[in-house]
Amino acid sequence: TTLGDTTVKLLDNESKLNTGEYWNAEDALYRLSSTNWDNSNSEVLSVFIPGNLDLTPEWISELNTLAQLDFTTPAILAANPDAVAIYFGGVLGQTMYYPNVNLAALVPPDFDITQRPWFVAASPAQNPTKSAAWSDPYLDAATNGLIITVSYPVYDSSGEFRGVQGMDVQLNQITQVVGNLKIGETGHAFLLDKNKRLIAMPAAAYADFGITPDAYPLGNVLDQAV
């Protein structure tokens, strides 16, 4: 992806970009009462480092370098209304998240980004081809809509795996299209994924099946009894 390639190029030029002239992790980060490392809510991005880790020169160098994503990522989000969030998870456990949602205050000190499904799916053991990985659709509590995550492995020029670039995308457009489809005079379309999870179902189709959105919300499996 373009965004993943941008992250790779930044890391390949880390020695030139890590000076902290634009943004300096050593000055910008502080510990919360939970011990998590946090940054100001007024900044463009959220930074999270687990509370059990110290802010080392290695952290500072990488964070200062990747802060240059501030110049491209907000514009990508603005140009793609269905994109909910863009983030980078590093192999050391650090997270840089757009937009700024005060991430460090939302997750526990032992939160391990490297164990998240989207990170694991793009990591070398699960993704030897180094291609983009797509999640199954899931219901997002914040937006109350279906989301998919695309994750892209980030390797530097030496071939070292540095982390995963992720993006959450809403499926609003496809659900609206399916909801507006008519089959014959009275029929309605609905959409399932390969695991029979509901992606889109209009109210009339729910009624035809004799079920309700509360019993079968989007993202849930439509069982054979239905």
Regions found by a protein language model. Give the residues of each.
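Soluble or luminal CAZymes and related metallo-dependent hydrolases
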Residues: S61-L69, T114
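Flexible, glycine-rich phosphate/dinucleotide-binding loops
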Residues: K9, Q94-T95, A141, L198, ...
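GAF sensory/regulatory domain recognition
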Residues: N18-S42, N52, G89-A104, D193-R197, ...
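Short amphipathic alpha-helical segments
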Residues: L66-P74, L171, T175-V178
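Juxtamembrane extracytoplasmic/periplasmic/luminal helical "stalk" adjacent to the first N-terminal
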Residues: T1-E62, A78-D82, S131-A132
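Intrinsic low-complexity, intrinsically disordered coil/linker regions enriched in small/polar
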Residues: L29-L32, Q173-V226
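Short regulatory alpha-helical segment in sensory/regulatory domains of signaling proteins that mediates
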Residues: G4, V8, T73-P81, Q126, ...
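Extracytoplasmic/periplasmic ligand-binding sensor regions of membrane-associated signaling proteins
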Residues: L77-N172, Q176
